[in-house]
Protein backbone atom coordinates (compact mmCIF):
# COMPACT_ATOMS: atom_id res chain seq x y z
CA UNK A 1 0.00 0.00 0.00
CA UNK A 2 1.74 3.15 -1.23
CA UNK A 3 0.69 6.49 0.23
CA UNK A 4 1.58 9.77 -1.47
CA UNK A 5 1.11 13.24 0.02
CA UNK A 6 0.21 15.79 -2.64
CA UNK A 7 0.32 19.47 -1.68
CA UNK A 8 -1.63 21.79 -4.02
CA UNK A 9 -0.12 25.27 -4.16
CA UNK A 10 -1.22 28.28 -6.17
CA UNK A 11 0.20 31.79 -6.03
CA UNK A 12 -3.03 33.76 -6.31
CA UNK A 13 -5.00 34.16 -3.10
CA UNK A 14 -8.00 36.44 -2.66
CA UNK A 15 -7.41 37.14 1.04
CA UNK A 16 -3.60 37.14 1.34
CA UNK A 17 -1.46 37.95 -1.68
CA UNK A 18 1.29 35.41 -2.48
CA UNK A 19 0.74 33.68 0.85
CA UNK A 20 2.57 30.51 -0.26
CA UNK A 21 5.78 32.54 -0.41
CA UNK A 22 5.20 34.49 2.81
CA UNK A 23 8.26 34.48 5.06
CA UNK A 24 8.21 32.31 8.17
CA UNK A 25 11.49 32.66 10.04
CA UNK A 26 13.52 32.78 6.86
CA UNK A 27 11.65 30.12 4.89
CA UNK A 28 8.64 30.39 2.56
CA UNK A 29 5.35 29.17 4.02
CA UNK A 30 4.98 26.41 1.41
CA UNK A 31 8.43 25.07 2.29
CA UNK A 32 7.40 24.82 5.95
CA UNK A 33 4.32 22.79 4.97
CA UNK A 34 6.42 20.50 2.77
CA UNK A 35 8.92 19.91 5.60
CA UNK A 36 6.13 18.91 7.99
CA UNK A 37 4.72 16.46 5.42
CA UNK A 38 8.10 14.76 5.12
CA UNK A 39 7.84 13.76 8.80
CA UNK A 40 4.84 11.45 8.20
CA UNK A 41 5.58 7.82 9.14
CA UNK A 42 3.03 6.30 6.76
CA UNK A 43 3.59 8.34 3.60
CA UNK A 44 6.08 7.08 1.04
CA UNK A 45 6.41 10.25 -1.02
CA UNK A 46 5.67 13.99 -0.82
CA UNK A 47 5.04 16.04 -3.98
CA UNK A 48 3.91 19.65 -4.44
CA UNK A 49 1.47 20.29 -7.30
CA UNK A 50 1.50 23.85 -8.66
CA UNK A 51 0.78 25.82 -11.81
CA UNK A 52 3.23 28.58 -10.88
CA UNK A 53 6.87 28.71 -11.99
CA UNK A 54 7.93 30.92 -9.08
CA UNK A 55 6.57 28.49 -6.48
CA UNK A 56 8.16 25.58 -8.34
CA UNK A 57 11.57 27.27 -8.48
CA UNK A 58 11.52 28.14 -4.78
CA UNK A 59 10.60 24.59 -3.77
CA UNK A 60 13.12 22.95 -6.06
CA UNK A 61 15.86 25.09 -4.54
CA UNK A 62 15.06 23.37 -1.23
CA UNK A 63 15.06 19.93 -2.83
CA UNK A 64 11.31 19.40 -3.01
CA UNK A 65 9.70 17.27 -5.69
CA UNK A 66 7.32 19.37 -7.80
CA UNK A 67 4.77 18.52 -10.49
CA UNK A 68 3.44 21.26 -12.76
CA UNK A 69 -0.33 21.27 -13.30
CA UNK A 70 -2.87 23.16 -15.37
CA UNK A 71 -4.01 26.61 -14.17
CA UNK A 72 -7.63 25.58 -14.74
CA UNK A 73 -8.19 23.41 -11.64
CA UNK A 74 -11.36 24.52 -9.84
CA UNK A 75 -10.17 23.33 -6.42
CA UNK A 76 -7.19 21.76 -4.70
CA UNK A 77 -8.51 18.22 -5.08
CA UNK A 78 -8.83 18.63 -8.84
CA UNK A 79 -5.23 19.86 -8.91
CA UNK A 80 -3.90 16.84 -7.03
CA UNK A 81 -6.03 14.48 -9.13
CA UNK A 82 -4.28 15.85 -12.21
CA UNK A 83 -0.89 15.39 -10.55
CA UNK A 84 -1.78 11.85 -9.44
CA UNK A 85 -2.10 10.74 -13.06
CA UNK A 86 1.70 10.78 -13.29
CA UNK A 87 2.45 9.63 -9.72
CA UNK A 88 1.90 6.01 -8.76
CA UNK A 89 0.04 5.46 -5.51
CA UNK A 90 -2.76 3.57 -3.78
CA UNK A 91 -3.69 6.39 -1.39
CA UNK A 92 -3.32 10.11 -1.99
CA UNK A 93 -3.34 12.74 0.73
CA UNK A 94 -4.52 16.24 -0.11
CA UNK A 95 -2.57 18.48 2.28
CA UNK A 96 -3.26 22.18 1.82
CA UNK A 97 -0.15 24.24 1.15
CA UNK A 98 -1.15 26.84 3.73
CA UNK A 99 -0.72 24.48 6.72
CA UNK A 100 2.87 25.18 7.87
CA UNK A 101 2.20 23.89 11.39
CA UNK A 102 0.42 20.68 10.38
CA UNK A 103 1.18 17.84 12.77
CA UNK A 104 2.74 14.79 11.06
CA UNK A 105 0.71 12.70 13.52
CA UNK A 106 -2.47 14.19 12.06
CA UNK A 107 -1.40 13.15 8.57
CA UNK A 108 -0.87 9.61 9.84
CA UNK A 109 -4.24 9.61 11.62
CA UNK A 110 -5.94 10.32 8.30
CA UNK A 111 -3.98 7.51 6.63
CA UNK A 112 -4.49 4.81 9.27
CA UNK A 113 -8.05 3.79 8.20
CA UNK A 114 -6.67 2.73 4.81
CA UNK A 115 -4.44 0.12 6.42
CA UNK A 116 -7.46 -1.88 7.66
CA UNK A 117 -9.61 -4.62 6.11
CA UNK A 118 -12.25 -2.09 5.05
CA UNK A 119 -10.48 1.05 3.76
CA UNK A 120 -12.85 4.01 3.30
CA UNK A 121 -13.48 5.99 0.13
CA UNK A 122 -11.97 9.04 1.79
CA UNK A 123 -10.92 10.15 5.26
CA UNK A 124 -10.54 13.51 6.92
CA UNK A 125 -9.96 14.99 10.37
CA UNK A 126 -12.28 16.67 12.86
CA UNK A 127 -11.52 18.62 16.02
CA UNK A 128 -13.97 19.01 18.95
CA UNK A 129 -15.48 22.43 19.56
CA UNK A 130 -16.20 23.30 23.18
CA UNK A 131 -19.15 25.46 24.35
CA UNK A 132 -16.77 28.40 24.82
CA UNK A 133 -15.80 28.13 21.13
CA UNK A 134 -19.13 29.69 20.10
CA UNK A 135 -17.37 32.29 17.94
CA UNK A 136 -15.97 29.51 15.77
CA UNK A 137 -19.43 27.97 15.47
CA UNK A 138 -20.69 31.25 14.03
CA UNK A 139 -17.62 31.91 11.86
CA UNK A 140 -18.27 31.08 8.19
CA UNK A 141 -14.54 30.45 7.72
CA UNK A 142 -14.77 27.60 10.24
CA UNK A 143 -16.28 24.53 8.59
CA UNK A 144 -18.45 22.39 10.84
CA UNK A 145 -19.29 18.71 10.40
CA UNK A 146 -21.89 16.27 11.72
CA UNK A 147 -21.29 12.51 11.68
CA UNK A 148 -23.22 9.28 12.00
CA UNK A 149 -22.59 6.78 14.80
CA UNK A 150 -19.91 5.01 12.75
CA UNK A 151 -17.93 8.22 12.30
CA UNK A 152 -18.86 8.94 8.70
CA UNK A 153 -19.74 12.48 7.63
CA UNK A 154 -23.39 13.33 7.19
CA UNK A 155 -22.80 16.94 6.20
CA UNK A 156 -20.27 19.78 6.23
CA UNK A 157 -21.36 23.41 6.51
CA UNK A 158 -20.17 26.93 7.15
CA UNK A 159 -23.30 27.39 9.25
CA UNK A 160 -23.47 26.18 12.86
CA UNK A 161 -24.40 22.47 12.79
CA UNK A 162 -26.06 20.81 14.50
CA UNK A 163 -28.50 23.64 15.22
CA UNK A 164 -29.13 23.63 18.96
CA UNK A 165 -32.72 24.47 19.77
CA UNK A 166 -31.83 24.10 23.42
CA UNK A 167 -28.20 24.71 24.35
CA UNK A 168 -26.77 21.57 25.90
CA UNK A 169 -23.23 20.73 26.95
CA UNK A 170 -23.90 17.12 25.89
CA UNK A 171 -24.23 18.08 22.21
CA UNK A 172 -20.99 17.32 20.40
CA UNK A 173 -19.83 19.84 17.81
CA UNK A 174 -16.84 19.38 15.53
CA UNK A 175 -14.73 21.60 13.34
CA UNK A 176 -13.41 20.17 10.10
CA UNK A 177 -9.65 20.14 9.49
CA UNK A 178 -9.14 20.37 5.73
CA UNK A 179 -6.84 17.41 5.18
CA UNK A 180 -8.09 14.47 3.10
CA UNK A 181 -6.85 11.02 2.15
CA UNK A 182 -8.39 9.28 -0.87
CA UNK A 183 -8.30 5.84 -2.38
CA UNK A 184 -6.80 6.29 -5.84
CA UNK A 185 -10.00 5.31 -7.68
CA UNK A 186 -12.07 7.74 -5.61
CA UNK A 187 -9.70 10.64 -6.25
CA UNK A 188 -9.82 10.07 -10.00
CA UNK A 189 -13.62 9.72 -9.88
CA UNK A 190 -13.89 13.02 -7.99
CA UNK A 191 -12.10 14.87 -10.77
CA UNK A 192 -14.51 13.47 -13.37
CA UNK A 193 -17.58 14.74 -11.50
CA UNK A 194 -19.06 18.17 -12.08
CA UNK A 195 -19.18 20.56 -9.10
CA UNK A 196 -22.35 19.73 -7.18
CA UNK A 197 -25.21 21.96 -6.06
CA UNK A 198 -24.32 21.89 -2.36
CA UNK A 199 -20.60 22.22 -3.10
CA UNK A 200 -21.28 25.45 -4.98
CA UNK A 201 -23.72 26.73 -2.34
CA UNK A 202 -21.30 26.21 0.58
CA UNK A 203 -18.06 26.53 -1.43
CA UNK A 204 -16.93 23.20 0.08
CA UNK A 205 -15.45 20.72 -2.38
CA UNK A 206 -15.95 17.68 -0.09
CA UNK A 207 -19.71 17.96 -0.59
CA UNK A 208 -19.17 16.77 -4.17
CA UNK A 209 -18.28 13.37 -2.74
CA UNK A 210 -21.25 13.19 -0.37
CA UNK A 211 -23.73 14.24 -3.05
CA UNK A 212 -22.46 11.49 -5.33
CA UNK A 213 -22.76 8.70 -2.78
CA UNK A 214 -19.19 8.47 -1.51
CA UNK A 215 -18.53 8.15 2.22
CA UNK A 216 -16.02 10.24 4.17
CA UNK A 217 -14.58 8.73 7.34
CA UNK A 218 -14.04 11.39 10.01
CA UNK A 219 -11.12 10.78 12.36
CA UNK A 220 -11.12 12.71 15.63
CA UNK A 221 -7.93 14.45 16.66
CA UNK A 222 -6.87 16.52 19.65
CA UNK A 223 -4.00 18.15 17.76
CA UNK A 224 -4.82 21.47 16.17
CA UNK A 225 -2.84 24.18 14.42
CA UNK A 226 -3.96 27.27 12.52
CA UNK A 227 -3.85 27.39 8.75
CA UNK A 228 -3.05 30.64 6.96
CA UNK A 229 -5.91 32.34 5.14
CA UNK A 230 -5.54 35.96 6.24
CA UNK A 231 -2.83 38.36 7.36
CA UNK A 232 -4.00 37.85 10.95
CA UNK A 233 -3.50 34.09 10.55
CA UNK A 234 0.00 34.69 9.19
CA UNK A 235 0.93 36.86 12.17
CA UNK A 236 -0.43 34.24 14.57
CA UNK A 237 1.70 31.51 12.96
CA UNK A 238 4.75 33.77 13.13
CA UNK A 239 4.12 34.35 16.83
CA UNK A 240 3.68 30.63 17.49
CA UNK A 241 6.94 29.85 15.71
CA UNK A 242 8.77 32.48 17.74
CA UNK A 243 7.42 31.07 20.99
CA UNK A 244 7.75 27.36 20.20
CA UNK A 245 9.65 26.63 16.98
CA UNK A 246 8.53 23.55 15.06
CA UNK A 247 11.29 20.95 15.00
UniProtKB/Swiss-Prot annotation:
GO terms for cellular component: cytosol. One of its GO terms (molecular function) is 3-deoxy-manno-octulosonate cytidylyltransferase activity. Its main location: cytoplasm. It is an enzyme of class 2 (transferase). CDD domains: CMP-KDO-Synthetase. Keywords: Cytoplasm, Lipopolysaccharide biosynthesis, Nucleotidyltransferase, Transferase. It is found in: Cytoplasm. GO terms for biological process: CMP-keto-3-deoxy-D-manno-octulosonic acid biosynthetic process; lipopolysaccharide biosynthetic process. The keyword Isomerase does not apply. It catalyses: 3-deoxy-alpha-D-manno-oct-2-ulosonate + CTP = CMP-3-deoxy-beta-D-manno-octulosonate + diphosphate. Pfam families: CTP_transf_3. Its EC number is 2.7.7.38. Pathway: Nucleotide-sugar biosynthesis; CMP-3-deoxy-D-manno-octulosonate biosynthesis; CMP-3-deoxy-D-manno-octulosonate from 3-deoxy-D-manno-octulosonate and CTP: step 1/1; Bacterial outer membrane biogenesis; lipopolysaccharide biosynthesis. Belongs to the KdsB family. Activates KDO (a required 8-carbon sugar) for incorporation into bacterial lipopolysaccharide in Gram-negative bacteria. This is 3-deoxy-manno-octulosonate cytidylyltransferase. The gene is kdsB.
